Amino acid sequence: MRISPGRQTILTLAVLTMLCISFADAFSLDMPTTQKYADTYNKQIENVPSVLKSLIGSEKVNIIVTREDGSNFQVGMDIVSARIERTVEGGISDPTIVITTTQSALGEVIKSTDRIAAFKSQTDAGQIRFEGKSWLANAKIKALLSSTSFLQFCYGLFFS
């Protein structure tokens, strides 16, 4: 079965969105906490149907969070076959997707009783940004983030 690159990118973005929301739970911007949440994600991904895991595919992702004091926390994730194979302090060279946000934006998500709505509000306001390294990836990111029902489905899949 051949899976189109478009489906792989959209599902990968859904996974990354859920990862950002899970990192918001921790709100501790350090490598041990990041690794803990990567490990938790990897355990959850084992419960996802194989067909969905095959659609998620592989990506190199950098997440950059500007802390309240103005410093940056940057972590790279090498996602292979839907699993986070490694986290890299400082980021990965040549990422396929870059997620940029602030500690205060994550705080808004944490405080909310409806984290999906808060996450969507922060992305709509540009406080949480996803950047694909191609125009096609950017178009797919925009389509994914505009679907609240899809975000809720993915959140339930990984965190229920």
Residue positions per predicted region:
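Bacterial N-terminal signal peptides
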Residues: 12-22
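Bacterial N-terminal signal peptides that target proteins for export
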Residues: 2-13
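Feature captures hydrophobic
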Residues: 24-160
